[in-house]
Structure formats: C-alpha cells, structure tokens
Amino acid sequence: MGRVRLASQRHRVRIAALQILFEVDETDHAIDQVLERRLTDEPMSAESAEFLRRLVFGTWEHRSYLDRIIEEAAPNWPVNQMPGVDKAVLRIALFELLIDEVEKTPIKAVINEAVELAKEFGSDNSSRFVNGVLGTVVTRYLAEREANEE
C-alpha cells in the first residue's frame, strides 16, 4: 500500500474520530454505541478500525489530562468555552503526540493533520488556533523528540 493511500485512510479515520468525539462530547451519547454505529455505517479495514478505536477510546479516556495541557498552552481559552470542533481536534492531536505509544506518528504529520481537520470542520480561525496551541505544546513537552525527528 502506498504512502498516499495510507495517509488518506488515516485522514478519514481522524475525521471519523473527530465526528465521534464531537458527538459524544456535545450530546452525552454513549461512546461505544456511537463508535460501533459509525463502523457499521462506514465499514473500513481492520487496521483502520483498530486505529479509530484507539484514537476514540484513548482520547476520551485521557480527556481531563489533555484538557489541562490545552489550558496550559492557551490560558485565555478555557476548554469548556472552546468550540467543540477545536476541542476535539486538539484532544486527538495531543493524544497522538503525548500518549499513543503504538503509532508514534511524526510530530509534523500530527500537526498537519490537526490543522487540516480544523480547516475542514472548524471556524475561520480554528486552524491558526490549533496550530498555535500544538506549537506551544511541542515546544514545552516535545522539543527533544522533535529535534530527533528532523
């Protein structure tokens, strides 16, 4: 499988994760039911489904920690007042950057994906906001890893 096709599949999985997490956060629907409904409605490869499950459940499980990181990086923007799309995009990206031990997606790829999701689904300012928050987090927490990826 080529890199472009894999990247495109990963992008679709991240879109699904964003939509699931947004729905669960905004409606209090049960996360496992929303995820399974999505997998039934939009079948995907076993590898993509596993990635989706890891993103959704991992991000949701660690959301309190991820929200603290967001608030440290953007102290003027309380998470509970943040647009739902921005919050979900940031949570997913931070889960990938700080917690997910399986993928170890390169920092630049995670940031680029998050910015693209913010452009696709957020407001006019979402992509700049997401990029700024993630840049701050990388500087504070991941500078050594970023240098090693260069």
From Swiss-Prot:
Q: Does the keyword Transmembrane apply?
A: no
Note the InterPro entries from the entry: NusB-like_sf, NusB_fam, NusB_RsmB_TIM44
Keyword list (alphabetical) reads: RNA-binding, Transcription, Transcription antitermination, Transcription regulation
Q: Which organism is it from?
A: Chloroflexus aggregans (strain MD-66 / DSM 9485)
**HAMAP family linked:** NusB
Q: Which GO terms describe its biological process?
A: DNA-templated transcription termination; transcription antitermination
The record's section on Pfam families has: NusB
Q: Which family does it belong to?
A: Belongs to the NusB family.
**A GO cellular component entry from the record:** cytosol
GO molecular function terms attached to this record? RNA binding
Query: What is this protein for, i.e. what is its function?
Result: Involved in transcription antitermination. Required for transcription of ribosomal RNA (rRNA) genes. Binds specifically to the boxA antiterminator sequence of the ribosomal RNA (rrn) operons.
Put simply, this protein is called: Transcription antitermination protein NusB
